[in-house]
Amino acid sequence: MAFLEVGNHTAVTEFILLGLTDDPVLRVVLFTIILCIYLVTVMGNLSTILLIRVSSQLHHPMYFFLSHLASVDMGLSSSVTPNMLLNFLIERNTISYLGCGIQQSLADFFGSVECFLLAAMAYDRFMAICNPLLYSTKMSTKVCVQLVVGSYIGGFLNASLIMFYFFSFLFCGPNRVDHFFCDFAPLVELSCSDVSVSVIVISFSAGSVTMITVFVIAVSYSYILITILKMHSIEGRHKAFSTCTSHLTAVTLYYGTITFIYVMPKSSFSTDQNKVVSVFYMVMIPMLNPLIYSLRNNEIKGAIKRQLGKKMSC
């Protein structure tokens, strides 16, 4: 039952997710592609976490943050991908009112935590390159744990705010969500409550997370660039640049898609374009991050070779 009588209103008890396409052939193709991407995402990020745990050479701050980033990437992808895959297999994909709120909150939680972790990683690179003599003190285990815990708390607070407002909305009319997951924007359009205040508050909260983390990243890399340009050694410059390249690539991909989805005016792109970019943000990026950090990082490549060597010798 999709509707329930509540007082003088008919409340929605479930939503219909319209997904990416109605074409049956394209649904099969997309199911196969996205399933493969999801499996690579899980295996790639799990491998990153395990490699960092078993390799003593990787037991320092940058890889501590990277292991948590891998966990968050798995969480972000898993919050929407399994349900999206189900959408391809059945004609009418429904999600309960409670399930919709939980899915939306999980996606926002992991998305927010990723922003904070990327900022923490930028700060770590700043300390390593600009203040190498103080690095071990300023980036102690205690400080790293505090930064990671702070990232999770920040993500929890942002997601809790969105969950609070979602469950305060009254949905009494159409229940067809033109998306492949319960995103806040299309749900607001379906609400028959006054959403003006909630939209302002949530926009401010999400905008604050984005602006604060972008500011930290921008300032960190500004100082890093100044420090690198002052280096006289070409080898030193190359080494400093190489330690930042992977993180800069991940930051560019992540914030580039966030900007397209949440910052650009809705009139400038269609709903279908928004869906495609959302797939890249929530499905592709979690798969790409382990590849970005492993292919461009000599320490990780060295750790992989050592672990494979140990396995071969057994």
Curated annotation (Swiss-Prot):
It comes from the Eukaryota. PROSITE patterns: G_PROTEIN_RECEP_F1_1, G_PROTEIN_RECEP_F1_2. It is found in: Cell membrane. One of its GO terms (biological process) is sensory perception of smell. SUPFAM superfamilies: Family A G protein-coupled receptor-like (SSF81321). Keywords: Cell membrane, Disulfide bond, G-protein coupled receptor, Glycoprotein, Membrane, Olfaction, Receptor, Sensory transduction, Transducer, Transmembrane, Transmembrane helix. Residues 1-28, 79-102, 158-199, 262-274 are extracellular. One of its GO terms (molecular function) is olfactory receptor activity. It is a multi-pass membrane protein. Gene3D superfamilies: Rhodopsin 7-helix transmembrane proteins. Disulfide bonds join 100-192. The keyword RNA-binding does not apply. PANTHER family: OLFACTORY RECEPTOR. Belongs to the G-protein coupled receptor 1 family. This is Olfactory receptor 5P72. It comes from Mus musculus (Mouse). The gene is Or5p72.
